[in-house]
Amino acid sequence: MNKKLLNPLEDPPTASSSEDVDEEISSGEDEKEHISNSSSSEEENELKDLSTQTLNSPSTEAPTLDSGSETNSDSDKPIVLTSQKKKEGTDSSGTKRASEGTSSKDIKRAKKVSGDDDNKKFQSLWTKEDEISLLQGMIDFKAETGTSAHDDMNGFFDIAKRYISFDVSKIQFGDKIRGLKKKYFGVRKKKGLDLDHDKKCLGLAKSIWGLDGKEVVVLGGDSETSNWFEKSFLVRVVARLGVDECIVKWKWSKVSKETKKRIEEKMKMVEAKELELLSQKIDVLKEVASVIAETI
C-alpha cells in the first residue's frame, strides 16, 4: 500500500495541543494563585476579626485575670485552713489535756472527800462513853491480869468489846487506841483541852501511857512506872545469860504484883547501899588525893 504523504504547507503540525497544555497549566496555576490569594485574604480577614475582637473585649481578659487571682487566693486558702486546723488541733489537744487534768483533779478530790467521809463515819461510830470505856478498860485489864493491853490485844479485845456500843472489829479497836494516844498527847503539847470529856480522857491516858506517853503498870488501882525494871541492870544481866531482852520484859509482865512489889523494895535497898558505898568510895578518894599532895 502506498502511504499518503503529508504536505507540510497544507497540513501543518498541530501545535495546539502543547499550547493548550500550556494554557491549561497556566490557567491551573492562576486558579491556584487565586485560591491561595483568596485563602490568604480570608485568613488575614479572620486574623483581623480575631484581633479586633480581642482588642474590643478587655472584659473577657479581666475575668481571666480575676479567675487567676481567685485561683491564687484559693490556692492560699488551703494553707490558711490548714493552719486553722492545726490551731484547732492544738486547742483541742490543750482542751483535752486540760479536761484530763481537771478530771484527775476531780477524781483526787472525790477520793479525798470519800476518805474524809469514811473517817467521819468511823469517828461517829465511837461515842464519848465508848472512848472512856476503852481507856478505863485498858487500866482495869492491866490491874487484873498484870499484862498490858498492847501485849495481849486479843484477850483485851475479847473482854472490852462487850462494853462498846457498836459491833467493833479488832482493826478498829487497835486504830482507836493508837488514835487516842496520838490525839491526847499531841494536843496536850500543842494546846490545852477545854472539854470536860477530853480532860477526863487525858487523865486516863496518863494512867496508861504516863506523863510522856510511856506505858505504866497499874497495881491495885495505883499506877506506878515499870521503867525502873527496864532501866535497871537486871534486864541487861539476865540478857547476858542468853535470854532476849524482849522475852525478859514480857516474862516480867506476867509476874504477880506482890512479887514485883517485893523485888522493887529490895532494889531500892540495893540502890541505897550503892549510894552509901559510893560515898565511902569518895571519902577514900579524897584521902588518897590529900596524901599524894602532901608527899609531893
Swiss-Prot record:
Species, as recorded: Arabidopsis thaliana
UniProt entry tagged with the keyword Transcription regulation: yes
InterPro entries named in the record: GEBP, GeBP-like_C, GeBP-like_DBD
Family listed: Belongs to the GeBP family.
Compositionally biased spans, kind Acidic residues: 19-28
Bias-annotated ranges (Basic and acidic residues): 97-119
Keyword annotations from UniProtKB, A to Z: Transcription, Transcription regulation
Sequence segments annotated as region (Disordered): 1-119
Annotated protein name in UniProt: Probable transcription factor At1g44810
Molecular function terms from GO: transcription cis-regulatory region binding
Compositional bias (Polar residues): 52-72
Organism classification: Eukaryota, Viridiplantae, Streptophyta, Embryophyta, Tracheophyta
GO process annotations (BP): positive regulation of DNA-templated transcription; regulation of DNA-templated transcription; response to cadmium ion
Any Pfam family hit: GeBP-like_C
Source taxon at top rank: Eukaryota
Keyword Transcription appears in the UniProt entry: yes
